Regions:
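Asp-based, Mg2+/Mn2+-dependent phosphohydrolase catalytic module
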Residues: 2-9, 13, 115, 119-216
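Surface-exposed alpha-helical segments enriched in charged/polar residues
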Residues: 100-103, 107, 160, 180
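Structured, non-catalytic alpha/beta "coupling" segments that mediate domain-domain communication
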Residues: 111-113
């Protein structure tokens, strides 16, 4: 690695749209079916309160109650269980190439972490679904901190959890504003749009050696 390329001792991953694929269309249909809602109305209600759910100022029952109220629908216990299950399924189609890469980094002795805007029920669901989540050296789940990306404090928390200065961490996220926030706290960062573009930028930035890591 060239001396002009920062030394990277940890890779910090966003969860949704990086370690997992785009939302599963069948799960959107499951969610809409609970309320017998049209697509536009459901999406408006779903996203209206999502930031508060991710941040932890709304817990799962409170979030779905807000969605139900916006749609003028009741929220029965059976419906709540189905909504939580379908919402977990929506965001848990693994991006296997990135999951495998994270495992390779871990085996090579490079720290790996997750920094995700993640609500409470979703964290439980992904940990129940994916055993590999526990292999990460540190997890930063937004709902536990009452913070969310792109706030600087959540990036600092992730760096502290990994035990490294931000400059030694490469952060990967699908959203530009989150990438900019990571850079502002001193991290290296790459926006993930698709895997070919990601590999190309890794090589262009001088981080290509990390794509096939060797034990340290």
């Amino acid at each position: 690695m060239s001396s002009t390329v920062p030394t990277i001792n940890a890779v910090l991953f966003d969860f949704g749209m990086v370690l997992t694929m785009p939302p599963d269309p069948a799960s959107w249909e499951r969610l809409k079916a609970v309320f017998s809602s049209d697509e536009a109305s459901f999406h408006k209600a779903y996203w209206k309160h999502r930031d508060d759910y991710d941040r932890g100022t709304l817990k799962s029952h409170g979030y779905w109650l807000e969605v139900a109220n916006d749609l003028h629908k009741p929220l029965e216990p059976e419906a709540l269980r189905e909504l939580i299950a379908a919402d977990i399924a929506l965001w848990t189609q693994p991006n296997q190439v990135m999951v495998d890469w994270a495992a390779n980094l871990h085996r090579a002795g490079i720290k790996i972490g997750i920094l995700s805007n993640m609500p409470d029920a979703m964290e439980v669901g992904i940990r129940d679904t994916f055993a590999w989540v526990e292999d990460f050296d540190h997890h930063t789940w937004s709902h536990r901190l009452l913070l969310a990306k792109p706030e600087a404090a959540i990036y600092r928390h992730a760096a502290e959890g990994l035990g490294l200065p931000p400059a030694e961490i490469l952060f990967i996220d699908d959203r530009q504003e989150n990438i900019e926030a990571a850079i502002a706290v001193g991290m290296q960062a790459i926006q993930y749009t698709n895997h070919d573009a990601f590999v190309r930028e890794m090589n262009e930035r001088g981080f290509g050696v990390l794509l096939n890591p060797v034990a340290r």
